[in-house]
Each structure stands twice: as structure tokens, then as C-alpha cells.
């Protein structure tokens, strides 16, 4: 009898360690937490940062034709103060303005300065041609100590027109220029406001002065306003510079009788460029396409948290210092306490295998030849193909060429400047929200996709095995026939033929099912066995007492 019991127990143990195949997914000991649309702090196996925070503290010019204007202001390249003599004509795809740069020598200002600056930043440089103006009966060599070369001089691209002699009358004049080129000409002229009426009379004669400028799209008259002003560069007078873009074949006509600063050459834009205001040094050994006042951002990420005022091919500025994009599946580190046989994990969706390093999804098996682990490349590749390129798609959605508007505005332009700054701040808020939403949506899709591929793989195996195996609720299938390594490989690569093993599986299932108990039934039997044992011990004790009393070996006295 004892021998039969031992044999039965041995059979059960051998069968319990029978052939088995389990499905699982990759896991790591320490994952990365990301946010989705519905949850925050979900741990995933892999994640990629989408916000760039690293900055190169130099303007990277490798592969570019930079122009460092130094002490020359960008607008000065149009009119030619002494500090801009070497930049009257230039070609560039990266224009760097410095804090020390100055547009003028004789005090004054440009109208619509910021708009003109933006045009020049994207100009690709400028070249010029003579407007062909000739004069008689007046002087064209006006000079000032404020614009010094070897001595007193003036703007290289402008003519300061004066009466033929002090206090002499200035004749009425008309000069015209037709744009012969196929692209717009940038025309700049000036109106001189003398430091006093006496000075104006000395320079241009007595009487009221009027300057009129006309083209097919532009008509404007100007009257100088002589008067005392604080001295700048030793001058109390001022020159206001005005400008227009003259269309091809269009003609601009100047009519004047004094106080007119005449253009000598028309400027033409060469192509396209980027312009940046910065005081950091240049570095020709490094390349980049995103620039700001503090240097260069070299990044392939869709967002950056370095500077909101940038130019070039720029990642969108967001306020968040980090937005992690999930590029791997949900991670639940392997818990040894939940292991079944040979490391099978209870709940294959809820737990992972840390050893599965060559794929996202895979198999572990046990058979007479031993144990093994293998990745499932088909399901892994299916998931990776859909997730690869997420970063590129985000970049496509977010990157665009930006222009920098970051200058001091004149009083008249201040309201426009306030609107620009308010708009910039509002756009930053909107894009910070959009960025978080975009990343959360992509993360939700990645996690759902990874879980879906796991379910597809599980269903694929279940449909192959059919009645030849039984699910055990832990992501494993207990196989009712002998399954060697070749058999296991056929399950993995979806070539398993269940009819080949049907008879053997049916026979083994009949032998195993009668003694197979679920964990719930085991608990019931355990308690039943405990109760039966107690009852048996009590019955034996009562029987012994009864025999002893009957034989006179024990006496029971009942007292009332």
C-alpha cells in the first residue's frame, strides 16, 4: 500500500514539472516614469527626452558664411557711417549684430526701424548700384565732425546737399530713379532738422523747406523742424532716415528745396539669411541651425527650454524642463515572489522578464531537454515599427523657421512692441500646453499598442495549441504531450501542427484531469482532512474509554 502511494505522488510531481511554455515581455529593474492622457507617473521600459536643455555658448558657424558686424549696426550698412565702411556690400547667410554696433554717426534715427532690421536680417547681404543723380548749383560735400574718417566726413552712401554758399538760396530740384532690376530696391533718404533756424538758413537759405517723395505706392511730404536739442556727438541737429522698397520698373521721385539728405546708391537684397543679436564668440568648428543671444542650440529634439527668443530651425520653446516620450512598453519589474516554475511570471501582462534583452516580447519554455528563453521578433518588430519615428513626427509637427524680434522699440513703436511681447508670451503658454498634450497622447498610444501586441501574441499561441495544452492563468500553457526544442520552436514561429500531437495530448489529459485540483478545492480538502482527523482521534479516545469502563479498568461516577 505504501509503495502505491509513493508511486502516485512521484507521478504527480513528474507531471507537475512537465513541458510548459510561457509568454512574457521585457522589463527592467528601474524604468522611467511618463505621463499619459489618463495617468501620471506610469513606469515604462524606455523613454526619450523631448526637451533640449543643453546649450553651446558660442555661435556655431561651420558650413555657413557668417558676417560679424562688430561696431557696425545692421542699418548702418545702408547709409555708411565710418564704422560700417567694410560692410557697405556683403554676402552672408548668418548675420551677427553686436551690442557695441552703431547704425549712425550724425545723431538721428530710422523710421520703422524694427521692420527694416527684420528685412536686412533675412536679406542674405546687400549689393548696391548708383542711382545716377547729378547736381549743379549746390554743394554735395556736406561733412560733419560727428562722422570722422581722416577728418570730418559724412555717410558714405548719402549726399548732404547744401546751398552753393552760406545763406544762399537753395534751388527747387527734382530727381528720379527707376528700378531696373527684377527685385525690389531699398531706397533710404534723410531729412535734416537743424539745431536752430539760423543754422537752417545758413545751410539752405531762408524760407520754408519741403521735401516730397513719390512712387506708385508711396507718397509722403516732409518739413524739417529746426530747433535746439541736446547735443549728441557734438551736434544739436538730427537726421531722420526714411525708406521704401521700390518695385521693379517703378520710379521714385524726390522733389526738394533744402534740408534733404539724398541717397547715392540703391540697395538690393542678395537672398536669404538669419540674423542674430549676440555678444558670444563665433566657433567655426561646430555647426548648428538654431541660434539665440546666448549661443547655439544643437538638437534633434522637438522642444527646448533654453531661450524663447531664437532664430533658425528651432525646437519649440516650452516652459517644462522635461517631457518624456515613451519608446517602450509598460514596465513592471520582475518580482521573484511571483515566479512559478523556472521563472514563469504570474500575470503576463502585469509582470515582465528582466532577462529578455533582445526583444520586447518572448517565450520561456521547459521540457525534457531543459529550459530556454527566446524573443519573438515578429511582435517586437511590429510594435517597434509603429513606435519608431514618434520623435520625428513630433519634430515635424513643431519645428518651423523663426525670426527674432528682440530690439528696443521707439516710443511710437512701443505699443507694437508690447503686442509682440504679449503675443510671444501667449504663444509660449499655448505651446507648453500643446507639447504636454502631444507627448501624453503619444505615450498613451505607445502603452496601449504594447499591451495590444502582447495580447495578439498570446492569442496566436492559444489558437495553435488548442486542446493540446491548458492555460494556467499565469501567462503559461501546460502542454499535454512531450514537446522537445524543435516542437517549442514551431510554437514560437507559428508552424506548430496540433493534429500531430492530438492523440497523445488527449490520453495524458484524461490521466491528469481526475487528480487536478484548483487552489480553491485544495483549501476545502485541507480543512475537510483536518476536521476528519480530529473526529477520528476523538472517536478513538471515546472507544478506549468505553472499553476500559466495560472491563472494569475505569470507573465513572456521576454525582448529582
Curated annotation (Swiss-Prot):
<keyword id="KW-0564">Palmitate</keyword>
<feature type="lipid moiety-binding region" description="S-palmitoyl cysteine; by host">
    <location>
        <position position="559"/>
    </location>
</feature>
<feature type="disulfide bond">
    <location>
        <begin position="483"/>
        <end position="487"/>
    </location>
</feature>
<keyword id="KW-1168">Fusion of virus membrane with host membrane</keyword>
<keyword id="KW-0449">Lipoprotein</keyword>
<dbReference type="InterPro" id="IPR000149">
    <property type="entry name" value="Hemagglutn_influenz_A"/>
</dbReference>
<keyword id="KW-0945">Host-virus interaction</keyword>
<dbReference type="GO" id="GO:0046789">
    <property type="term" value="F:host cell surface receptor binding"/>
</dbReference>
<keyword id="KW-0261">Viral envelope protein</keyword>
<feature type="disulfide bond">
    <location>
        <begin position="105"/>
        <end position="147"/>
    </location>
</feature>
<keyword id="KW-1043">Host membrane</keyword>
<feature type="disulfide bond">
    <location>
        <begin position="72"/>
        <end position="84"/>
    </location>
</feature>
<protein>
    <recommendedName>
        <fullName>Hemagglutinin</fullName>
    </recommendedName>
</protein>
<dbReference type="GO" id="GO:0016020">
    <property type="term" value="C:membrane"/>
</dbReference>
<keyword id="KW-1164">Virus endocytosis by host</keyword>
<comment type="similarity">
    <text>Belongs to the influenza viruses hemagglutinin family.</text>
</comment>
<keyword id="KW-0325">Glycoprotein</keyword>
<dbReference type="Pfam" id="PF00509">
    <property type="entry name" value="Hemagglutinin"/>
</dbReference>
<dbReference type="GO" id="GO:0046761">
    <property type="term" value="P:viral budding from plasma membrane"/>
</dbReference>
<feature type="glycosylation site" description="N-linked (GlcNAc...) asparagine; by host">
    <location>
        <position position="46"/>
    </location>
</feature>
<keyword id="KW-0348">Hemagglutinin</keyword>
<feature type="glycosylation site" description="N-linked (GlcNAc...) asparagine; by host">
    <location>
        <position position="493"/>
    </location>
</feature>
<feature type="transmembrane region" description="Helical">
    <location>
        <begin position="524"/>
        <end position="544"/>
    </location>
</feature>
<keyword id="KW-1170">Fusion of virus membrane with host endosomal membrane</keyword>
<keyword id="KW-1162">Viral penetration into host cytoplasm</keyword>
<keyword id="KW-1015">Disulfide bond</keyword>
<feature type="glycosylation site" description="N-linked (GlcNAc...) asparagine; by host">
    <location>
        <position position="421"/>
    </location>
</feature>
<dbReference type="GO" id="GO:0019031">
    <property type="term" value="C:viral envelope"/>
</dbReference>
<keyword id="KW-1160">Virus entry into host cell</keyword>
<dbReference type="GO" id="GO:0020002">
    <property type="term" value="C:host cell plasma membrane"/>
</dbReference>
<dbReference type="GO" id="GO:0075512">
    <property type="term" value="P:clathrin-dependent endocytosis of virus by host cell"/>
</dbReference>
<comment type="subunit">
    <text>Homotrimer of disulfide-linked HA1-HA2.</text>
</comment>
<dbReference type="InterPro" id="IPR013828">
    <property type="entry name" value="Hemagglutn_HA1_a/b_dom_sf"/>
</dbReference>
<feature type="topological domain" description="Extracellular">
    <location>
        <begin position="19"/>
        <end position="523"/>
    </location>
</feature>
<keyword id="KW-1165">Clathrin-mediated endocytosis of virus by host</keyword>
<keyword id="KW-1167">Clathrin- and caveolin-independent endocytosis of virus by host</keyword>
<dbReference type="GO" id="GO:0019064">
    <property type="term" value="P:fusion of virus membrane with host plasma membrane"/>
</dbReference>
<dbReference type="GO" id="GO:0055036">
    <property type="term" value="C:virion membrane"/>
</dbReference>
<keyword id="KW-0472">Membrane</keyword>
<keyword id="KW-1161">Viral attachment to host cell</keyword>
<feature type="glycosylation site" description="N-linked (GlcNAc...) asparagine; by host">
    <location>
        <position position="249"/>
    </location>
</feature>
<feature type="signal peptide">
    <location>
        <begin position="1"/>
        <end position="18"/>
    </location>
</feature>
Amino acid at each position: 500500500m505504501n509503495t502505491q502511494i509513493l508511486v502516485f505522488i512521484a507521478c504527480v510531481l513528474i507531471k507537475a514539472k512537465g513541458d510548459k511554455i510561457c509568454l512574457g515581455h521585457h522589463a527592467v529593474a528601474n524604468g522611467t516614469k511618463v505621463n499619459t492622457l489618463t495617468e501620471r507617473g506610469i513606469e515604462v521600459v524606455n523613454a526619450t527626452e523631448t526637451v533640449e536643455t543643453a546649450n553651446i555658448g558660442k555661435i556655431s558657424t561651420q558650413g555657413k558664411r557668417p558676417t560679424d558686424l562688430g561696431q557696425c549696426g545692421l542699418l548702418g550698412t545702408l547709409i555708411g557711417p565710418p564704422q560700417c565702411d567694410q560692410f557697405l556690400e556683403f554676402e552672408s547667410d548668418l548675420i551677427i549684430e553686436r551690442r557695441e554696433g552703431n547704425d549712425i554717426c550724425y545723431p538721428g534715427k530710422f523710421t520703422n526701424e524694427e521692420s527694416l532690421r527684420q528685412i536686412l536680417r533675412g536679406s542674405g547681404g546687400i549689393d548696391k548700384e548708383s542711382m545716377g543723380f547729378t547736381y549743379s548749383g549746390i554743394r554735395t560735400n556736406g561733412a560733419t565732425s560727428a562722422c570722422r574718417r581722416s577728418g570730418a566726413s559724412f555717410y558714405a552712401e548719402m549726399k548732404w546737399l547744401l546751398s552753393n554758399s552760406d545763406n544762399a538760396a537753395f534751388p527747387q530740384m527734382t530727381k528720379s530713379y527707376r528700378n531696373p532690376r527684377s527685385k525690389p530696391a531699398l531706397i533710404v533718404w534723410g531729412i535734416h532738422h537743424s539745431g536752430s533756424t539760423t543754422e537752417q538758413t545758413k545751410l539752405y537759405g531762408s524760407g520754408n523747406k519741403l521735401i516730397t517723395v513719390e512712387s506708385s505706392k508711396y507718397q509722403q511730404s516732409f518739413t524739417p523742424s529746426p530747433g535746439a536739442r541736446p547735443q549728441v556727438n557734438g551736434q544739436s541737429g538730427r537726421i531722420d532716415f526714411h525708406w521704401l522698397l521700390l518695385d521693379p520698373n517703378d520710379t521714385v521721385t524726390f522733389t526738394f528745396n533744402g534740408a534733404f539728405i539724398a541717397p547715392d546708391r540703391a540697395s538690393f537684397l542678395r537672398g536669404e539669411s538669419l540674423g542674430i543679436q549676440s555678444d558670444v564668440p563665433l566657433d567655426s568648428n561646430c555647426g548648428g541651425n538654431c541660434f539665440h543671444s546666448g549661443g547655439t542650440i544643437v538638437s534633434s529634439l522637438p522642444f527646448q527650454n533654453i531661450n524663447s527668443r531664437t532664430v533658425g530651425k528651432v525646437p519649440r520653446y516650452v516652459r517644462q524642463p522635461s517631457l518624456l516620450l515613451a519608446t517602450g512598453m509598460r514596465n513592471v519589474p520582475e518580482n521573484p515572489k511571483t515566479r512559478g516554475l523556472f521563472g514563469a511570471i504570474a500575470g503576463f501582462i502585469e509582470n515582465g522578464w528582466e532577462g529578455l534583452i533582445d526583444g520586447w516580447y518572448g517565450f520561456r519554455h521547459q521540457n525534457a531537454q531543459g529550459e530556454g528563453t527566446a524573443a519573438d521578433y515578429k511582435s517586437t518588430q511590429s510594435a517597434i515599427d509603429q513606435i519608431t519615428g514618434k520623435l520625428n513626427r513630433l519634430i515635424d509637427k513643431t519645428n518651423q523657421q523663426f525670426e527674432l524680434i528682440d530690439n528696443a522699440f521707439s516710443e511710437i513703436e512701443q505699443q507694437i512692441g508690447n503686442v509682440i511681447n504679449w503675443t510671444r508670451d501667449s504663444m509660449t503658454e499655448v505651446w507648453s500646453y500643446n507639447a504636454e498634450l502631444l507627448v501624453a497622447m503619444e505615450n498613451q498610444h505607445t502603452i496601449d499598442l504594447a499591451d495590444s501586441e502582447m495580447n495578439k501574441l498570446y492569442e496566436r499561441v492559444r489558437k495553435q495549441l488548442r486542446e493540446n495544452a491548458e492555460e494556467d492563468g499565469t501567462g503559461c500553457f501546460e502542454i499535454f504531450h512531450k514537446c522537445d526544442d524543435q516542437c517549442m520552436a514551431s510554437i514560437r514561429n507559428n508552424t506548430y501542427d496540433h493534429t500531430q500531437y492530438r492523440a497523445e495530448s488527449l490520453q495524458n489529459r484524461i490521466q491528469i484531469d481526475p487528480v487536478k485540483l484548483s487552489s480553491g478545492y485544495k483549501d476545502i480538502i485541507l480543512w475537510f482532512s483536518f476536521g476528519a482527523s480530529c473526529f477520528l482521534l476523538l472517536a478513538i479516545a471515546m472507544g478506549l474509554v468505553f472499553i476500559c469502563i466495560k472491563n472494569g479498568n475505569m470507573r465513572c461516577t456521576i454525582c448529582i
